[in-house]
Structure formats: structure tokens, C-alpha cells
């Protein structure tokens, strides 16, 4: 597919089905991470804009054109959005690449997943109609009970910059499928395609207020959304410290939250792997895909001593072969990280690892052939101790740290030696061993003989400090539904006979 040359659309905030200028008229620069140039501006919402969006959402839930829709009717909107996204795939992939820095072919693949995700939740929305009211059998014949599954209400969706439109879809699609009215606050570092989703919703005729999109800074737009008394739920994907702030603010209103936070996931490699090159490639993919900016990245390689020298030698050869370039170039496999702040943070992690006694086996700096942009070489760090920062903390960049083990028990201990619990991988041909590790891993996701494949049908989420709640699959739809019990006394002519009846005069 040819990569189009396009201009950056100049959008406003998307509120109540219309483009509206922020009340304070503030805008933020869009910086292309590949060349550090300002390529446009996004609107910066503040508390007043949040309040307008919440009022629009409440109004949408009261109106018949959204609040009274069936699942089948909502499914038509979701399928129309999917079709429009597919139609605009080349443009959206290009916008995402110049906004986020990921290789264009990865961005294009993400857009395919966006389409599939909207279609999947369209199917689930239709299925909701037959599940909306479910009878519950009781032990007393004088009562009957059923359960209603209703939209939770107005939901705030706060999304990250590493998969801008895809992470948006992970939240928007199930929220709309459930019949909620959603307010999206994407990361200010990569908002372009989320704003384009607003234009797509306008084009397909999504009822006003069903989805509003507010770009801007976290403390100016995100915080007021979280603490707004008329927002019924918050779903957040992002950093642990921000997740703690969101959880604390939401707790003041006893507001439910879903949190998908950071990770420091292990990939455990045994000496009985099926194929050396296949195992090496999965190890690279698990850490360096999406420029290393993946919450579930298997960035801790835990490898059996007996295969470590051979494996690391081959890993080094493969790593040196990774094409680092402008992400719009053909065959680019590693682009820039998202921002100068992230670039400096990653280099500081690498520097600290070296100061603490680790060895930089490869990388650790800017590629020599790229003078501008936030590029960092894929980096492999060995001689790592479990007390080191590089072992403990999420880097969120193309940095792999390595530690060896002798026996299974040691590998499990190392794998679980983390405050996080999002993902974990094991590479071994011994499936009984893989099953033991599946049970022993303290994580929400386990990969066997692979790393990072992600599908929209199974659940996605972690444990420990990686958050709680699940996205994707039917589990995500449940996040946006309220379960209401309805019990009827079916023998109203018969007295309940709890109190003594007054004497008749």
C-alpha cells in the first residue's frame, strides 16, 4: 500500500457532535518525533470544556436517538465507523506514524485491528439484545426475579500514546456497544487520529453526545474528567503514578475505575527451544516492537545458562540487522520514541545501568546515521543484578536486560521478582513445563513460545501494580454495563404476614 502525502488536519474539540473551539482558545504543538519539527496544533481542553462534554453526554442518554437504542441499532453505528476507518486506512496510518513515530507498516496493521475491533463489538452489541433481561430461578414461588444489563452511564476514557487509535478503540467500541455515552481524553503526545475518529463519527451520523473527544493536558482536561461528579466510570491506560492519582480521585466519589498500567514482563528461555532463530526473533519482537514502547513488553530476558552464550551471540546478530530509520521509510523496523522527555528518560536508565555495574552488550545511544529525531538504538544489557534499577523499573523503550538461571525454580523466582504483573512468556518445547510456568507466573497474560500477540477476543489486563479489570473480549463490554436486580412479588393478594394485622373495627 502506497504511503500518501497528507496535511495535518486542524481540528477543534469534538463535543455534542460538533467541532468546538476550546473556551480558553489554547492549543498545543504536535511534534513529529522523527525530525523534532512542529507539524501542527491540537486544541487544549480545560475544566469548562469537560463540563460541556459531560452535559452533552447526559443529554444523549436522555434522548431516544441514543439512550433508547437497541444493541442492533448501536451495532449499525459501530459497523459504519469500521467501514469508514477502513476507507481512510492509508491516511490514518500516515497520521499515526508522523504523530507517534512507529513504523508505517505497524501503524497500518493497527488500523486493521481498529476495524476488526469495532466490528467485533458490533456483534456483541447485537447479542446484548437477547441478554438484556435474564431470569434468575428462586427457591420461593411467590417471587420472580430477573436481571437487567443496562448502560453504566457517562464514562471517561483516558488513553495512551503508544497505540493512539487502537487503544482508543479498545475503550470506545465496548463503551458505545453497551450504550454508554463516552468522553475520550487521548494523550496530548499523540492525539491526531483520535480527533479523526470524531470526524468519522460525525460522517456516519453517530448521535450527538454519544462520543465527545477532548484533547489536552492531563492536569487540565484529564483530572477534571476523573473528578467530575456526573461521570460514572473511568477507564485508564497509562503509567502507574498517573493510575494511582486517578484511583485516588475516583475513590472520593466511589467511582469505579479500570486501570491498565505498566509492566516489566519476563521472557523465560530454556535450552530445549524448538528453533534458535525463532526464539531469538520472538525475544526481539517482545521488546523492540513499537519502538519498545509497549506496556506488556517482555523486557527481562531470563535465559538458561546452558544456552546463554549461543543465544546471546545470535541475538546480537539479529539486533544489528534491525533497520532504524524514518518510520515512513520502507522496511523500517525501529523508529523514534515519542518525545524528547521519553528519549532522555530512556538514556538515563541506560546510563544508570552502566553506573551500577551492568554491561551494555549492544546499543545504548543514538544511531550515528540519524542526527535529528528521538532515535535510540535497540539496547541489550547483560550482567544485570536484581537490585538494579534496570531490572526493577519500566523503561518503555527499546531496552532488553538479561539474566541467566540454572533450574526451573530459579527461573520462576526471577520471573516473579517484580512489582508488576501484566505479561509473561516462556519458550520451551516441554509443554508440561510450560503448563507449570503458566500456573506459576504472577501475571494476567501468558504467552507460550511467543511474545506479544494480541487479539480482540481474549481478555487483556494484569495484576499487582499493572492494574486491575480487563479490556477486550466480552470482559470489556461488562466494564460498561450495570447489573440491575428486579424482583416482583407475584402473589399480591396474599398477605406477607410479617407484621400482626391490626384488629378490624
From Swiss-Prot:
The keyword Ribonucleoprotein does not apply. It comes from the Eukaryota. CDD domains: ALDH_F10_BADH (cd07110). This is Aminoaldehyde dehydrogenase 2. One of its GO terms (biological process) is glycine betaine biosynthetic process from choline. The record marks 162 as: Transition state stabilizer. GO terms for molecular function: 3-aminopropanal dehydrogenase (NAD+) activity; 4-trimethylammoniobutyraldehyde dehydrogenase activity; aminobutyraldehyde dehydrogenase (NAD+) activity; betaine-aldehyde dehydrogenase (NAD+) activity; gamma-guanidinobutyraldehyde dehydrogenase (NAD+) activity; protein homodimerization activity; sodium ion binding. Gene3D superfamilies: Aldehyde Dehydrogenase, Chain A, domain 1 (3.40.605.10), Aldehyde Dehydrogenase, Chain A, domain 2 (3.40.309.10). Its EC number is 1.2.1.-, 1.2.1.47, 1.2.1.19, 1.2.1.54. The active site is at residues 260, 295. Na(+) binds at residues 31, 99, 189. Dehydrogenase that catalyzes the oxidation of several aminoaldehydes. Metabolizes and detoxifies aldehyde products of polyamine degradation to non-toxic amino acids. Catalyzes the oxidation of 4-aminobutanal and 3-aminopropanal to 4-aminobutanoate and beta-alanine, respectively. Catalyzes the oxidation of 4-(trimethylamino)butanal and 4-guanidinobutanal to 4-trimethylammoniobutanoate and 4-guanidinobutanoate, respectively. Forms homodimers. Coiled coil: none annotated. Belongs to the aldehyde dehydrogenase family. Pathway: Amine and polyamine biosynthesis; betaine biosynthesis via choline pathway; betaine from betaine aldehyde: step 1/1. It catalyses: 4-aminobutanal + NAD(+) + H2O = 4-aminobutanoate + NADH + 2 H(+); 3-aminopropanal + NAD(+) + H2O = beta-alanine + NADH + 2 H(+); 4-(trimethylamino)butanal + NAD(+) + H2O = 4-(trimethylamino)butanoate + NADH + 2 H(+); 4-guanidinobutanal + NAD(+) + H2O = 4-guanidinobutanoate + NADH + 2 H(+). Keywords: Metal-binding, NAD, Oxidoreductase, Sodium. It holds the Pfam family Aldedh. The keyword Oxidoreductase applies. NAD(+) binds at residues 159-161, 185-188, 238-242, 261, 394, 460.
